Amino acid sequence: MASQGTKRSYEQMETGGERQNATEIRASVGRMVGGIGRFYIQMCTELKLSDYEGRLIQNSITIERMVLSAFDERRNKYLEEHPSAGKDPKKTGGPIYRRRDGKWMRELILYDKEEIRRIWRQANNGEDATAGLTHLMIWHSNLNDATYQRTRALVRTGMDPRMCSLMQGSTLPRRSGAAGAAVKGVGTMVMELIRMIKRGINDRNFWRGENGRRTRIAYERMCNILKGKFQTAAQRAMMDQVRESRNPGNAEIEDLIFLARSALILRGSVAHKSCLPACVYGLAVASGYDFEREGYSLVGIDPFRLLQNSQVFSLIRPNENPAHKSQLVWMACHSAAFEDLRVSSFIRGTRVVPRGQLSTRGVQIASNENMETMDSSTLELRSRYWAIRTRSGGNTNQQRASAGHISVQPTFSVQRNLPFERATIMAAFTGNTEGRTSDMRTEIIRMMESAKPEDVSFQGRGVFELSDEKATNPIVPSFDMSNEGSYFFGDNAEEYDN
């Protein structure tokens, strides 16, 4: 984006910092992931997990969820005020898997939230380390993006299920801060806004009184976040209209859905960060790696390098394919659920297949699943090359944004065309161009019509050998121009249910 003078880099958002230079950013991001690693090691000690059990991704997820729950102020307050049967508001826990006599056993553990908070703060130099918590939320969100489809949620808000590539970060909690807002897709922001407007339509008092004033501030803030993701003047002008509306209603919902559709071709800028499971940082810290001293970046070579030398295991159900389970976690680690499969495959060095062809369910194991038949296997999370993560959406320039396949939001800054089915997308734009946003709508449609599927994005950007940490020799891959690669093609994944 042209005007990045005032923007903080998303490493700065991630660490809550003011403007810092590159070295300071690397150090503070390093401090953040180092703290996660120290916390994880301490939890493994508390739970007396063996080395193998500590590398089990399911155990990592349980421990991550416990600390997120321990710091969820609003929910904790709610639980204390609305005691529900069988839920202790002061405790948190989950399933821990242990290896016993050649079999995997599930053990449900329960901890005082206060105790978990103490361990977390201790691992983070006595601070609350909110940035580390957000980092874990984004890792869970990336895992959800790769695992589940949000068709139902899209349909409920009146959007088209084919807009799934705009839904990055749709399961992030509201408290995920600026770093969370940066990774949310256009569709996610639109959906949050539509839900808000619908509540206002159904509940007369939603915008009224002291609470309503706060609601209004939240509404305008969300509008500004979404506006900042758009890269064309007309899209931004439409967002101003939506934001300034005296009494948001169906007209605003229409405008928002129009904007979401337009983002399939005039893509928004959405940040991508490689957030890894806590156990990976734990392994590195345990082996003596000093993240803060070495520095760390979420968008460069560091996560790739970390995954090259980490062995992580996963429980595998009887008819699941371990290679497919690995692909799922690899995509989650690199926030690549919405990336073009041609690009992901090239970087990973093995073919990345669409989700409809995966023989694997989610990573987490439900409490009613039979442990007798559970096996475990090593996740293959290594890559052949590395590439810089992007936040641009891959539009060729400001004036004329380039084309987007109906289902790609680029993750890696790598030269390619972004193929799309123009007829499918444009069919949605017949009809309504009257009303107060008519000139903007006309302008947006004109830009979309002039976008070409064969336009090359990220000109000259390539992938790098893993030995090339300074990114000096880009290798620009050549792709079959016609062959689009959406992960969600022929999809049969399960829905995301809270």
Swiss-Prot record:
GO terms for biological process: symbiont entry into host cell; viral penetration into host nucleus. Its main location: virion. Belongs to the influenza viruses nucleoprotein family. GO terms for molecular function: RNA binding; structural molecule activity. Residues 1-21 are annotated as: Disordered. The keyword Disulfide bond does not apply. One of its GO terms (cellular component) is ribonucleoprotein complex. It comes from Influenza A virus (strain A/Tern/Turkmenia/18/1972 H3N3). This is Nucleoprotein.
